[in-house]
Amino acid sequence: MADAPVRRHLLLAGGSALVLAALAATRPALAQPAFDHAHAAWTALLKKHVVAQRGGQASQVRYGNFAADRAALKAYLDALSAVPEATFAAWSKPQRMAFLINAYNAFTVELILTKYPKLESIKDLGSVFQSPWKPKWVPLLGTKVSLDDIEHEMLRKRGAYDDPRVHFAVNCASIGCPALREEAFVPDRLEAQLDEQALRFMSDRSRNRFNAQRGRLEVSKIFDWFGEDFRLGHRGIASLPAFAAKYADQLADAPAEREKVRGAQVDVAFLDYDWKLNDAR
């Protein structure tokens, strides 16, 4: 019976293992850390590295300084990537929309930093066969998506948000693009932030204006590329001239010119887009 103590030890060890397994099976799964809908980490980075110009009508980015803060940026990107699709789906619409806008902007900065300072435009990151917005390299909601997916298949998807103001919130790292806001978009202030982004952009005469000599509106190419988004009836507006009418005071100076814009019966021309990097060198 010399091996009896050994057998007893094995039986006790086996029993302990079964008890531990049973406890593990009944213990609730560890909860995912609560997501910070204030996006405080992203705001901290933006406040350090974004230079607002002309009251926020435009902005430049200190990409060189951003590169020195790469660890903080990656920590924020990791927090975005850790959100499961089921969790995202359970959020409110403002929470989802703010998340996607911030994700687009933050991953765009990360994309620029992969080659900075050896580029003059985000387009330098593409090729003859594929634009820089097409590769599916962004880990988001449990899969790999492209920047185009975030913008066109999530934010612009019909029935999801149907809000043309998104075009004044996402930033493509280019001078022609609406300003990268110097703070994160947050759910509880999202409406006000989107309204302000639209006002800032429409106030920038270098990109949107009424040309009195030619008697026409001259606006950003964004309105040409995404004109359909301004015909969806958001806030009762179903055309680009009707949208521009809201900003008559920003687009024109003389009262008669403003009345023409408000009448929403003006011709529209689209300005060339400046794809140079929005770099504060």
Q: Which functions belong to the PLM regions below?
A:
Residues V6-R7, T26, S59:
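Short, intrinsically disordered low-complexity segments
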